[in-house]
Amino acid sequence: MRILNYTIINLVISKSLLLNMNGIKKGIIHIIGIGGIGMSAIAEILHNSNYKVQGSDAQSNNNVDRLQKLGIEIYIGHNANNIKQAQVVVYSSAIKSDNVELVAARNNNKTILHRSGILAEIMKDKYVIAVSGSSGKTTTTAMIASIFDHSNTDATVIVGGILNSYQNNSKLGKSDILLIEADESDETMLKIPANIAVITSINNDHIDHYGTFDNIKNAFSQFINSADFAILPDSVGINDSESVSIKFGFEGVYPFVIQSPFVVPVHDIGIKKKKSASCSIKASNVKANNIRQHNNSIEFDVLIDGCSIDRSHWIPASCTETTAVLPLSSTQITSLRSRIIKNVVLSNAIGMHKVSNALAAISVAIKLGINDVDIKKGLLEFKGVARRFSLVADIKDVKLIEDYAHHPSEIQATLTAARSITKGKIIGIIEPFRFARIRNFFDEFIRIFMMFDYVILVPVHPPEDKPILGCRIDDIQEALISNGFNNVKIMNDALLISNFISDSTNSGDIVLFIGAGINVARLARETVVFMSGVEI
């Protein structure tokens, strides 16, 4: 279902609150790797929609525990017998082709769906808002969800992180709106039928999957062009080989554009003009200005440039320098009102990159017609996302913070955010994620690690990842020392880490536990226990 004129006042409420996946046989749906952050969200949505769900995972974790409490049967360990009763078997790109359950499913002619396939089924007859990007997509999706929750927009939400407001990574809503974080690592975002496509940022991560940086940019371009409407950073530069991440200006103005992909954009963002278009219309800008970082929140003003548009003649009427393009009926005249939303407070946020995330969320809200009061309330009540610059503990005025960053640009953004709230030392407890990523960005990692005051390296995640010559943590340590950075150690013991922190920190210092793996998260909590005697 493609809805072009879609605002809050004309939301179509589903006659049935349950998902209706006619393409999938009724029966047991078995999810391989059900404890993963994305797969667990799918499992819960299906379960809450009265589908019979079971699954398996190599080991138990918090997601597995949560799903088991809901009554979902989960096998620990993979075994061909696990899928005997299943009609449908779901897997993700993380599951190898020789997985015993996947092999058994093929041999027994089970219906097999990739994660993107089951998502496509879930999204049938939904108005889909898909948030993708190299970084920032989880936080942006969570901010949109918070605005929805405070504007009576009862959307279904599927996100790749634990939202603190839900203590969960999914929610089954009653409206036809579905908000989803769209994974770019395996091109899942290209299989999602998005009505609104949101890009948060683009960098050269996942080069092993895509082959070249141009392929990454082309994939995001396809993502935009497949949607009815696109929201993306002003300087995302899909066709720019030099820099494609969000660029923050020097004057404190952070633009985000709202752009309908059937026109040529004002900025070179790789959106091709569709055949139905007969002229170029510039995009609307949504900007943040007068930005103030507080202790655990950011306050700013939102500037919205708009114009009136007569789609019957494809000629902008009384447009400002940057103009809005909304998907309307062929004869309708509308306007995106130029205005300022003063004193927006984004709670539980530190760092200018969070402002960009908020602007993307605000842009979605504007597109859907959510009023300014509800937008402000949703961001004020934003509770954050687990492991996204999350405070683990504050011990003797030394803050222990964990963050999911694992790409060099993400680690640098996390470090910059920490520098913005302290003049003290910053210690990085860093768990590199995958040897291939270390190989691809070795020099960048070295450059950024040298920006810390101290670095403690922990073993590469995941532990089963095949080592690459020259990319071990010993090699990282050696490279740092050879470049004159001697404040680096290798540790994998919370007691040793806690002793080091106690001996090396003073009031006002910050310790960052950085990485996407479970080991660094475990170390963060165990370190707190050793330092404070309090379990968390």
From Swiss-Prot:
Signal keyword on record: no
Record-listed E.C. numbers: 6.3.2.8
One Pfam family linked to the record: Mur_ligase_M
Record's subcellular location: Cytoplasm
Catalytic reactions of this protein: UDP-N-acetyl-alpha-D-muramate + L-alanine + ATP = UDP-N-acetyl-alpha-D-muramoyl-L-alanine + ADP + phosphate + H(+)
GO CC, alphabetical: cytoplasm
Gene3D superfamilies linked: Mur ligase, C-terminal domain (3.90.190.20), Mur-like, catalytic domain (3.40.1190.10), NAD(P)-binding Rossmann-like Domain (3.40.50.720)
SUPFAM superfamilies found in the cross-reference section: MurCD N-terminal domain, MurD-like peptide ligases, catalytic domain, MurD-like peptide ligases, peptide-binding domain
Domain of life, source organism: Bacteria
Pathway: Cell wall biogenesis; peptidoglycan biosynthesis
Physiological role: Cell wall formation.
Protein family: Belongs to the MurCDEF family.
Protein name according to UniProt: UDP-N-acetylmuramate--L-alanine ligase
Organism: Wolbachia sp. subsp. Brugia malayi (strain TRS)
Gene symbol of the encoding locus: murC
